[in-house]
Design a protein with these regions (language model features):
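Conserved metal-binding segment of the jelly-roll/cupin
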Residues: 103-125
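Non-catalytic, conserved peripheral segments adjacent to functional cores
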Residues: 1-106, 126-127, 137-188
């Protein structure tokens, strides 16, 4: 596994080797000990999810206010997507900053999203499937969203007709969530 830190400290892109022969391919896409060794970040998954999306589906921006926070390991296993990670930690020097990463099923790439960050993605193909490994279990009462179309975030999504859930389409702005004290806090 090769790891590179992206433009926001603590956000990592991991590339794993894909081995193949006449039978198909094999990929070890996450190993906690290797990730810790390369990043000094302890990530132990407690839940795994799959998400299937049609082309132009925009999901997010989602985040958790779980007591211990929630980090994610995101991997595309079919199709391709434009993945967005945004720092939502009030008081962080990178608050509101975001990075985009294109994930493709045949790339061997995954993204690590630390606690206190939001996540969204745009499916670039039909039959796009991503996996999420989560550091804490899903708890609906602690899950929140911010509009991925909030103009104050200056997110340059591709110019397409998005397919969105009503929940994401009507999600509040970053400023609204901040004023409501519904954002994670930065901890040194």
């Amino acid at each position: 596994m090769k790891i590179s830190e992206l433009d926001i400290p603590g956000v990592f892109k991991a590339t794993s080797r894909i081995d193949g022969d006449h039978r198909g391919t094999f990929r070890e896409w996450f190993k906690a000990s290797s990730f810790f060794e390369l990043t000094n970040t302890n990530f132990i998954p407690t839940q795994a999810n799959l998400s299937f999306s049609s082309k132009n589906t925009l999901r997010g921006i989602h985040y958790s206010l779980a007591t211990d926070g929630q980090s994610k390991w995101v991997t595309c296993v079919s199709g391709s997507l434009l993945d967005l990670v945004i720092d939502l930690r009030v008081g962080s020097p990178t608050f509101g900053n975001h990075v985009f990463v294109t994930l493709e099923s045949n790339s061997g790439d995954s993204i690590y999203i630390p606690k206190g960050f939001g996540h969204a993605f745009l499916a670039l193909e039909d039959h796009t499937c991503i996996t999420y490994l989560l550091s804490s279990e899903y708890e609906p009462t602690l899950e929140y969203e911010i509009s991925p179309l909030d103009s104050s975030l200056k997110i340059n999504w591709p110019n397409v007709d998005f397919i969105m859930s009503d929940k994401d389409l009507n999600a509040p702005s970053l400023e609204s969530q901040k004023v409501s004290n519904l954002l994670p806090k930065f901890r040194d």
